[in-house]
Amino acid sequence: MKRNTNSSNKTRRLVLIGALGGISIFLGISGLGLIRLPIFSLTIMHIPVIIGALLEGPIVGIAVGLIFGLFSMYQNITAPGLTSFIFWNPIIALIPRILIGVISYYSFKLLKHKIKNTGICVGISAILGTLTNTVGVLGLTYILYLDRYAQAREISREAVAGTLLTV
């Protein structure tokens, strides 16, 4: 009997999206995915997005990134904090998270032809995916909410600009 590999691939991708999306949500709910600092939070919730993209391609990365972004919106709507308004905006909550998988996958694909060491390619791609999230969220916050963010934190525009642009 001939096995339908296309159906098997779709099933594997769907399972991976569910598993990695679930890990992202677990990291968010448990608090293990966030490191809270006075002015902003660092996250490791993007790591499942990178893993999905590198294992199964950009579609899986996009799907897991979308789950990460939607959960971020949900968290900031249901348990708002001082600067939650930033993540109520789908441009900030979703686009950088979706792009993590795209950038990670295509940078890996490009690098593997230039660099023979797969581990180095994975490392560079993971760094680029991480930077996609960081630069995307902080850059869009700067562009869209600089004054409102400064007011919420009760600090000057210059202090916010310096912080956002140097992180």
Model segments located where?
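Loop-helix junctions at membrane interfaces
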Residues: 1-167
